[in-house]
Amino acid sequence: MTKIKRALISVSDKTGVVDFALGLHKLGVEILSTGGTAKALREAKMPVIEVSDYTGFPEMLDGRVKTLHPKIHGGLLALRDKPEHTQSLKEHNIGLIDMVVVNLYPFEKNTQKPGVSIEEAIENIDIGGPSMLRSAAKNYRSVAVVCNPERYAAVLEELRNNNGALSRETLQEFGVEVFRETSRYDHMIYGYLKKHILDKAQDKEGAFPHCLGLNLVKVQDLRYGENPHQKAAFYRDAGETQGLAAMKQLWGKELSFNNILDLNAAVNIVREFSLPAAVFIKHNNPCGAAQNQDILKAYKQAWSCDRISAFGGIVALNREVDLALARLIAKSGFLECIISPKFSLETLGLLKDKKNLRLLELPVGAAPRGRPEQCATLDIKRVWGGALVQDEDILTLDENNLKTVTKQKPSKKEMESLIFAWKIAKHTKSNAIILAKGTKTVGIGAGQMSRVDSVFISTKKAGKLTAGSVLASDAFFPKEDAIVLAAKYRISAIIQPGGSIADEQIIQTADKCGIAMVFTGIRHFRH
């Protein structure tokens, strides 16, 4: 057990600190403090020793130097059971410090403010705080280090129950927690400065540095993971204010791991469209999608693609849910989630009758566009003993680069439909085949090991609507069998990347079948 006799308290987040310090004082602990923290404690009529008085050295450089002093760090780092250290402390008149209570400048919060300058961001980089935390944590066997206000109550309770002392287990736990906190803090600063002060010429490592760390902040614990026997939690990128973590749940029970996965897939698709759009997702694949001038019609068309698969699905919309749409949703059978930029109050009143439906609001902005090297987001997939890291697939279709390779040219209407289907194929598990009419899907074949099987499934889903539809494929056709099958079902046009060694044969087959074919030069595998 470690008896706490002297504590240094210097915090940015002053939540609960006065009551905590008062509790320490009642236990006979001497309090050292700095700046605003010392002021808050004095205002609470507590005896406080200013660090500058304790060290005999004033704060300087606009407060940049407060606690960087041997009398502070010597008192934290000295090994209590080492005679040489004890002797050095006596020679230099340095007292032991048994507890450090520090939390850091809110770098993340302050750098998210609109218009914050680099100079302002740099002034929010804490130096003294991490130094004290690390010194105390290095000597965790003898020094208690508290960096989280949520710990205050438990610390006081343990001190009261143990005559002002803390257990070895508590000190160990706190010491480890510090290095998690300081590493997160440093990584956040690194990410901000890399983004804002390095240009591409200076950033030698680019998106794939020698060592890659993740800086994630927990949003919530989840009931379980992909399956009930797996534990799970939802995290956001530190410093990120947009994305799924920003969604607001208006109604329904707690989101599951699979709900969030499917919501992500759904939102990524509707972000492809500027006109009103709706998408139904099941098991991370679209089972219906549509774009229309009217969001109500878009919803109807998306739902009609595959009503059986849509049961129990996730729906994303890029327009407000009004009362008319809410009435249609209420008649659509069981759905897990609806995510939309906005729900009106009367809409909420109607949809809350569906107890198992979750309603979520999220501003759905346009998807990032450009080339992968322009994307700041990394796509990370875990493998055994490591990870695969790549740019996010944000490459967009430039209609000027489309190449019609067949004698038959797609009509203007067919081209519009092909481009729509291509956007859906981009977000569908490979092998992906999308059949569309106008700007609505009529059949989707996803996740098959054989591309011709995906074509077959999409035609079965579309039924009579296959005739006159267009087809999008996320990757090239290795054989002409899929083209022959498409012709059998009277599909009129195909869009695909091209690039197969069998391209000439594929084109000849399309010509024989009277099918228009367009090459994009872009592949969108999704494993």
Where are these regions (language model features)?
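C-terminal binding/interaction regions
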Residues: 333-360, 485-527
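N-terminal glycine-/serine-/threonine-rich phosphate-binding loop
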Residues: 1-54
